[in-house]
């Protein structure tokens, strides 16, 4: 089985350790991994801001970059959702590119979805002793319907005590450009999320979308909260070394 890594902008620029963790996870699963260098932003910020033509250019570049990939795996439910839902929407009136968009979507998977449902991994052997909560991101849980897969993998990490996060389905307030355009509302939303996290007395927040982790983690640091923030890939990879 050959897998291509769709690294995403946030991992490339702000969370390189997440990309490294995905490589470790794929190696542990015995998967042959490559990295198409032609990949770029999925186009979601442009699309959500109304710049349709710019988003199409990004989408076409992504389609070309992964044209020959057997499977495409990304550590982001948000970017996977963009490929699955909005590429097809953008190219509805263009039969050639619509077909290519469908072909790309059919091969693109969020990381935990791929590990659980394609690789069938039900015996993840790792160890990390922490009290944690898991944040369900909007795009991953609502748009892709992926809710149980990350929790299933985390439940297999020895020593990891996952507490139930109150109102876990509530948005953290990031929403890409929403956090910039509606900053005061976004700030209120992330403060509410942090209150719910603190109520569990967890010392670790785990998530599967780096936008959410950047938003919540940034607020935690500004408020001097002693709560660590990790991507699910980092947790699974950390455990492999214990």
From Swiss-Prot:
GO terms for biological process: lactate metabolic process. One of its GO terms (molecular function) is oxidoreductase activity. GO terms for cellular component: cytosol. Disulfide bonds: none annotated. It comes from the Bacteria. Belongs to the LutA/YkgE family. Is involved in L-lactate degradation and allows cells to grow with lactate as the sole carbon source. This is Lactate utilization protein A 2. It comes from Bacillus anthracis.
């Amino acid at each position: 089985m050959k897998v291509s890594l769709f690294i995403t902008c946030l991992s490339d620029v702000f969370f390189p350790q997440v990309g490294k963790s995905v490589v470790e996870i794929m190696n542990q699963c015995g998967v042959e991994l490559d990295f198409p260098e032609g990949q770029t932003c999925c186009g979601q910020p442009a699309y959500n801001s109304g710049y349709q033509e710019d988003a199409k250019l990004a989408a076409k570049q992504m389609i070309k970059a992964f044209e020959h990939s057997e499977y495409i795996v990304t550590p982001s439910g948000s970017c996977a959702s963009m490929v699955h839902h909005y590429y097809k929407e953008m190219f509805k009136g263009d039969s050639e590119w619509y077909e290519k968009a469908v072909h790309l979507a059919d091969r693109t998977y969020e990381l935990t979805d791929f590990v659980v449902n394609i690789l069938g991994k039900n015996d993840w052997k790792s160890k990390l002793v922490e009290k944690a909560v898991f944040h369900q991101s909007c795009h991953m849980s609502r748009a892709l319907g992926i809710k149980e897969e990350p929790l299933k993998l985390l439940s297999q990490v020895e020593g990891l005590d996952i507490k139930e996060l109150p109102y876990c389905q509530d948005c953290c307030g990031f929403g890409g450009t929403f956090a910039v355009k509606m900053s005061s509302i976004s700030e209120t939303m992330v403060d509410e999320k942090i209150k719910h996290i603190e109520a569990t007395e967890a010392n670790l927040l785990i998530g599967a979308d780096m936008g959410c982790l950047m938003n919540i983690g940034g607020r935690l640091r500004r408020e001097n909260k002693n709560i660590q923030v990790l991507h699910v890939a980092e947790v699974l990879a950390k455990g492999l070394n214990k």
